[in-house]
Amino acid sequence: MDVLMAECTGLWRRALLVGADGSRDAGGNVRWLQGITAYVDSRGFAGPLHQHGNVFEWHRDVDLEPPGPFPDAGAMHWDGDVLVETGVHEDYSEHWVRDADLAGPCAAAFLRSPDGARGLLMRVGDLFGWAGAGSVVIGAVGGVEWTNLRIAPSDDHVDAVGQRWSVELSEGKSIS
């Protein structure tokens, strides 16, 4: 069955990674928060997700690591309730399970800092994703991470981590 990006809104936890050498990692410490198109990945990157047929491509507007040699793209399919991603440019397979089916607001602001760096603030239900100023965080709106980042969104800017970030593009309803 085809996977539609619109079906993927919510918090996902990686249940399995199978590498090119057959190695397996079943640790569930990798999370991915998906909004309308915006996403934040706990491995340290964020940006817009694009879909071309059954292939999802994660564009990394914010990336804490140097760019890899290939685009981050995976062919997606359902195996029951498990979302299976198979590498397009690299040999791997990841199995994702929905960690939380979130109801409520879904919005994102693609940001620019005063020094020109990119950032992203998104919200899906009661969770938020932040990427910018050297950090990537997924947490609860109003929770300790939100408070520590000093996030204060408005229509045309977001105050966070001691800076005023300009909103370059937004999607969905209000983040606050």
Residue ranges and their predicted role:
Residues 1-44, 55-176:
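Lipid interaction determinants
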